[in-house]
């Protein structure tokens, strides 16, 4: 099994560990009711929740307020020129909590992550929460264990999902380790260490493609369900090959009395077993694992709840 660097989700000094990654199978009693059931022009419906898409990138773009004051803040981060798909209001909030910069938001194949559906690995992020959400994605280049620290690193993607049904498709090249988190309803802060204080998704593409949900930064973070589909073309009306969510193939703090964790021995991987799930132990004795089934190309559907 290939070594894979998970972005440890707490203090900087705890983010130096490498681990071997693994995968999960959905519980037979788990019913995921988010299948796309209708197609009409640029609008899909997920159980009657519309997913608005543009014809160019199959992603929703929100312009937001356009005033000069909305594009400025007291932060060093500039909102004067907005990346594709990021609203001025969302950029302004990101600046107010101390983020280093807005995302690059490439709309072409840049060899890493970009907005669009033409890559070997695609991620569809769906707002199912009913409140404005800002998607934040990062690339862990050269095993950079600080890549998720948004106070010192520029993310690859920051994208506005302003209402229920808002969706965007992101492509990733093979061989890409990275992750995502989300800002909910203009209320999610950065942690004291500079990470988004919410639930994380972590992934690596390529030969040992794996994805997991991590709750280590904030055990009380917002809920997310991640469904893994096999090689493209993908039919999301079929059952996924694997599911990771808040209770399945998820990293959680071992102690129920803490709100966050990250030290060796302080967390565990729960409910990650089955033919499409893998669990392991790294050299420090920490659990490793997550959802596989999308080697060198596949589709990941992420629903924010």
Give short role names for the model-derived ranges.
Residues 138-142, 185:
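Folded extracytoplasmic luminal domains of secretory or organellar precursors
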Residues 3-8, 22-120, 149, 185-305:
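Extracellular low-complexity, O-glycosylation-prone Ser/Thr/Pro/Gly-rich "stalks"
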Residues 9-14:
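Sec-dependent N-terminal signal peptides
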Residues 122-133:
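Asparagine-centered strand-capping/turn motif at beta-strand->loop junctions
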Residues 143-147:
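Surface-exposed binding patches on compact interaction domains or structured appendages
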Residues 120-122, 167:
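Intrinsic-disorder/low-complexity, polar/charged segments enriched in Ser/Thr/Lys/Arg/Asp/Glu/Gln
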Residues 148-182:
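Intrinsically disordered, low-complexity Pro/Gly/Ser/Thr-rich segments with frequent PxxP/GP/PP motifs
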Residues 17-21:
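C-terminal segment of classical bacterial N-terminal signal peptides
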